[in-house]
Amino acid sequence: MTSAQCPALACVMSPLRFWGPWPLLMWQLLWLLVKEAQPLEWVKDPLQLTSNPLGPPEPWSSHSSHFPRESPHAPTLPADPWDFDHLGPSASSEMPAPPQESTENLVPFLDTWDSAGELPLEPEQFLASQQDLKDKLSPQERLPVSPKKLKKDPAQRWSLAEIIGIIHQLSTPQSQKQTLQNEYSSTDTPYPGSLPPELRVKSDEPPGPSEQVGPSQFHLEPETQNPETLEDIQSSSLQQEAPAQLPQLLEEEPSSMQQEAPALPPESSMESLTLPNHEVSVQPPGEDQAYYHLPNITVKPADVEVTITSEPTNETESSQAQQETPIQFPEEVEPSATQQEAPIEPPVPPMEHELSISEQQQPVQPSESSREVESSPTQQETPGQPPEHHEVTVSPPGHHQTHHLASPSVSVKPPDVQLTIAAEPSAEVGTSLVHQEATTRLSGSGNDVEPPAIQHGGPPLLPESSEEAGPLAVQQETSFQSPEPINNENPSPTQQEAAAEHPQTAEEGESSLTHQEAPAQTPEFPNVVVAQPPEHSHLTQATVQPLDLGFTITPESMTEVELSPTMKETPTQPPKKVVPQLRVYQGVTNPTPGQDQAQHPVSPSVTVQLLDLGLTITPEPTTEVGHSTPPKRTIVSPKHPEVTLPHPDQVQTQHSHLTRATVQPLDLGFTITPKSMTEVEPSTALMTTAPPPGHPEVTLPPSDKGQAQHSHLTQATVQPLDLELTITTKPTTEVKPSPTTEETSTQLPDLGLAIIPEPTTETGHSTALEKTTAPRPDRVQTLHRSLTEVTGPPTELEPAQDSLVQSESYTQNKALTAPEEHKASTSTNICELCTCGDEMLSCIDLNPEQRLRQVPVPEPNTHNGTFTILNFQGNYISYIDGNVWKAYSWTEKLILRENNLTELHKDSFEGLLSLQYLDLSCNKIQSIERHTFEPLPFLKFINLSCNVITELSFGTFQAWHGMQFLHKLILNHNPLTTVEDPYLFKLPALKYLDMGTTLVPLTTLKNILMMTVELEKLIVPSHMACCLCQFKNSIEAVCKTVKLHCNSACLTNTTHCPEEASVGNPEGAFMKVLQARKNYTSTELIIEPEEPSDSSGINLSGFGSEQLDTNDESDVTSTLSYILPYFSAVNLDVKSLLLPFIKLPTTGNSLAKIQTVGKNRQRLNRVLMGPRSIQKRHFKEVGRQSIRREQGAQASVENTAEEKRLGSPAPRELKQPHTQQGPEKLAGNAVYTKPSFTQEHKAAVSVLKPFSKGAPSTSSPAKALPQVRDRWKDLTHAISILESAKARVTNMKTSKPIVHSRKKYRFHKTRSRMTHRTPKVKKSPKVRKKSYLSRLMLSNRLPFSAAKSLINSPSQGAFSSLRDLSPQENPFLEVSAPSEHFIENNNTKDTTARNAFEENVFMENTNMPEGTISENTNYNHPPEADSAGTAFNLGPTVKQTETKWEYNNVGTDLSPEPKSFNYPLLSSPGDQFEIQLTQQLQSVIPNNNVRRLIAHVIRTLKMDCSGAHVQVTCAKLVSRTGHLMKLLSGQQEVKASKIEWDTDQWKTENYINESTEAQSEQKEKSLEFTKELPGYGYTKKLILALIVTGILTILIILLCLIEICCHRRSLQEDEEGFSRDSEAPTEEESEALP
């Protein structure tokens, strides 16, 4: 026995030893498979279109100590981060250098100013401080202009200078000083070292003649502009070669600043003007001169507050004082120093200077400047009491009068934009000197603040100080024009600006000088403003750091030459300076002694806050000189250096330029350029009214100054973020200022667009402005006009401007994604370029230059309706952006015929969910990517004719939805030779295929005949048709369903047919294909040859008339159930809203449902055969139950309605057990009874088919619908519905335990069925494997059936979260709906109806048991619909739901801009909602594609179906979606049945050999099924690994059992043998006994 047993054990163990290591190896392989099978998670990261500002520049302290002395280049702006080259000089001037740079530039002034603690300093103190600062700061530091740009691109600066009028100054690159001046922005600008040593010597001279020295210091640069010295200085002033010239100025201007830039006689000033860069003014030897320029130029990014106080001094002493205190320019000194920068230069060589100036800046102004030079002295004298300017009086007293008017001091602080413009005319020269000092100090502290503003302020002073070299010097420093005196018109930059004004100002020397001086000052900030006169206008634009303000404020002096004369007249009355400082940002004060008088009333203090974008402009009435001086001090804020804007005159010119200045789009990116609406007369009137009663705080320009500059400034306040511009204009004296204010509408709309208002003043100025205003002057004018109309408070202005701002900012946002030009042409004016109407956008028959090169994106609200037809025929579209179609989500017909498309990608049509007709004919398409048409599940027609397609590669027509509706495909007129895409042949609905005029072989025809069973008409190439016609009779005899239509040409054609052998052979492959087709299809196929005149086009007119067959309510019912079978609340409301649109009959609903169920049952009867008859019978029973439930639903509805009327809660507790039992049984049975579990899964939820078939609630009773429609109008009825629903939800909680127990029972039931079936089948171990696989499949289904059941139980988190989406989606979810809907109903009936439509669509009548609702009440989920992501409690808190709902609506309304057109970079609330919904549905709808479709449809219905004009389209979408789900479910039923009956085939073909899908139809179907199977989706490999693992586990267990059994047997046998052995002796012994 033992020996016999051993062989048996060996037999058993040997296989074990053989198979033992195998499982280990398999486990390793499985592990690798599992790792590879990790599900791919893709998350869409929304792109953010928002441009991030570079960040607010560091605050610039007004104190010089805050400025780094060590960075010589500090004043320079970083070229890369802030590239303001496009802004032009004005922009550069406007853009404050980085805080350090600007700080350095401002240092001299800040030191003098801050050290004194007041703007005005004693001449000695001022000079000393300037010298110290000069010593401390390198030339680059002193200059506010960015050295990088100036050094790197002097040419650009020259161009800027030309723009600004500094061309002449810049044009004199001869002298190194000019070069320094080029660098002055970066290096020597504050203290132009290039000025002749003479000038420096003068600056070094004792401050005794401080009055003169101050101006001369500043004038040193301008003094260099003096006709005589200017020529010398041009050659040597920068090189300090003109020291000989210094003596003249030295006498007048002994100052430390003069030492650096010794004030030159008017002659020298001329030379300084010649400096190619405003450097002359920037680099005058005298520090005071440079310092002067610095005050003008100084901009402090962080806190930029520049006050420009100019007091014209009648005497040379004033200029000296100004020299000492560069801000103050004595009339005498001023011409020399200031004139260098400004055209104030002495009249000695007026013609020469004119030439030089004009060369440097603009030749136009020489004569004017000469006149101005003369007049400037006069002006200086005339303004004997120049109104004191704000702290920073850049221009000499005379100039201040004119210049201040032209340029209010503007201080801009990127973080804090505070624009204070205070112009106070000083009656006396001494006052002007004081102002100059103060100005210089301010500029010292605020050099960086806003060089352009200061420069602006300074240059206007030049005309006044033409007599005084000192003031000119200051202005020169402030502006680039310092080299040339105004008289010489070397300050041509200034003069040019002023020149336009000078014709008028020529009479008024002061005004012209002021204009000149203002430009002169601008030179100092070449970075900010290159050209003084033009630059001043640019300066007026006060450079703002893109980070903070991003906008340039360019006030245009409304009053021009006359204005300055008027100011001259009124100079005795110093306007009270208005220095409203913005809370956080730079304050810009633009007071001018002369201008203040006339313009000061005009110049309101303008405060701009980036954050609030609120601009407050308060004009201050001009007062006497004494007042002007104190205001200066007050104006100067140590924290915010004030930037002096150009005087009105300069502002006129400069503002036009400044207006032009653009700011980087990153920040505010908008330039505000006010237009001076008032012309010379208004300015005169303003001057007359120059002393405003006080500067009323007019958010917009004050009456006086507001007219010219303030109007512009008013325009300045805009906040890109808020796009809220508040402009309040309080005219102090005249009404004109308000019009000006109105004119100065801030043009926030275009952040990147510079708005340049054109001055309405003199023609000369307007011309200059127009030139300067390269940016659309017309547009600016229009804007200004609109603003003028808005003269009212900023709030009123805001609407007009805001609309503009929003539209433009929107354009800019789009610009982020697409070129602005393209957007401007395509997005903004789409309905102007194309034809919009009747739901159609037609862009055909355009001029060649207008033709589209890419798909245009419409702006929101461009068209009130939706575009269902897009016709882009005959354009130049060569590429389709992936997200461009989001703006056309409702498009059903797209015509791209006759364009330049070369290839199609899988995302080429993303977003066209509703598209049905696609015409791509007559393009240049060569290749079509795989899955190209997958985003188009409802596509019916494709026209690809007349292209260059040579092959249809694998997957061209592949789509997860199988292209269920595609019935017409045109491929003719293509060099098509191969068709390798099996999906083309398997298109389920294809009825018309045109392959005429192609090169397809006979093999393609065979595949079509074999696989395209629904094809009704096939057009083949003529040669192939003729070959077939030769065997017409044979073919039609073999297959009666194939008909050949042969034309006369084929009958008479005897051409040899290469396919003759194959076709003619009765036993050949072709005939066999025909026989096979006859066996499995009855559809008649007509084969025709191509028509000789066959056109590649197709008439699409008939397609539009085609309508979906929606007469059967079952379509709608199933549609809704497919979309959201989970929501079973208040279904009648959904139907009452949807059915009218879908034109469903109001009767026969139950019958239709019954018929549908019957049809489904018949189909299943055909499929379910054999041992599954039990399932078939069970399904029939389920169908009958569903019908009974359907019929009983009507009674239930009626009862419910009655209960609702009575206001009593529905007695649901009694009914629930019965009601739930039906659906639960259905859901439970569906899992194991129906082979169509894939259908459930495919239909977007494990509930699809079972619920649609068994759920009576999905279709409302026929009689109930009309009643509901009638009641819907009754608000009280709607409220009662909600209340009863809420009560019902509360009552249904009791059903949860039942549901849970039922679920368990269902699982038990499933197992028991399996056990019964297994013994029944019992065949072999193979069968056992089969049964195991079947169980495995069923177990995979169980989670979904469980999901269905769990939908009813609160424990199902996934579903509950899904339900929570509904609060936003469906106020009608019984959980959250009651409160939400109730509130909305209280508001309006229409709102209720709309919401019902939007959201009830989601609720959909589901077949789910009532119990499902009960869980909803308890769910607290973060609503995924809520973009904010805040969690709220659906049921309990009414307020939360209501608020959330409102929030969603708001988000939907506001979303279009970011959502649709920014190709977002920021995902819209709709996108976020869709993503969250997709995630929530993951556990319920494992199939990724179906889940995405369902989520997208739900999102569309929720977010985009609120409008009445889209409700019909929405209803169509719902119907189509339901139809698609039905088709997919029907297909999966057959597949599922086959798979369950043939598990071996399912196992091998479905999972193991995916590549074989293209080889055989069966394998293909199996593969598709696996894709649709619940639980497989993207985890096919994982499932395969699990299956293999299960098999291995079973094998191992079996082997172990076998071994154990064998071992036991051996033990038993051993025991038996042992027992026998033990018994044997006993017998022997017994026998042995006797």
UniProtKB/Swiss-Prot annotation:
Q: Which residues lie on this side of the membrane: Extracellular?
A: 36-1581
Q: Which residues are glycosylated?
A: 296, 1079
Per UniProt, the ranges with Acidic residues bias are: 1624-1634
Instruction: Specify residue ranges for compositional bias: Polar residues.
Output: 172-189, 223-237, 307-326, 433-446, 760-770
Q: Which residues lie on this side of the membrane: Cytoplasmic?
A: 1603-1634
Q: Where is the composition biased (Basic and acidic residues)?
A: 1181-1191, 1201-1216
Task: Give a GO cellular-component term.
Answer: membrane
Composition bias, kind Low complexity: at what positions? 238-249, 358-368, 482-493
Q: Does the keyword Transmembrane helix apply?
A: yes
Localization: Membrane
LRR-type repeats, residues: 137-160, 230-253, 267-290, 864-887, 888-911, 912-935, 937-959, 963-987, 1002-1027, 1124-1146, 1151-1176, 1359-1384
What main location does UniProt list?
Answer: membrane
Q: Which N-terminal stretch is annotated as signal sequence?
A: 1-35
Q: Which UniProt keywords apply?
A: Glycoprotein, Leucine-rich repeat, Membrane, Repeat, Signal, Transmembrane, Transmembrane helix
Topology in membrane = Single-pass type I membrane protein
Region Disordered: start and end of each range?
Answer: 53-104, 129-154, 172-531, 619-642, 758-777, 1181-1227, 1306-1329, 1614-1634
Residues that span the membrane, as ranges: 1582-1602
**SUPFAM superfamilies in the record, alphabetically?**
L domain-like (SSF52058)
Which PANTHER family does the record match to this protein?
LEUCINE-RICH REPEAT-CONTAINING PROTEIN 37A (PTHR23045), LEUCINE-RICH REPEAT-CONTAINING PROTEIN 37A-RELATED (PTHR23045:SF19)
Which family, according to the similarity comment?
A: Belongs to the LRRC37A family.
By what name is this protein known? Leucine-rich repeat-containing protein 37A3
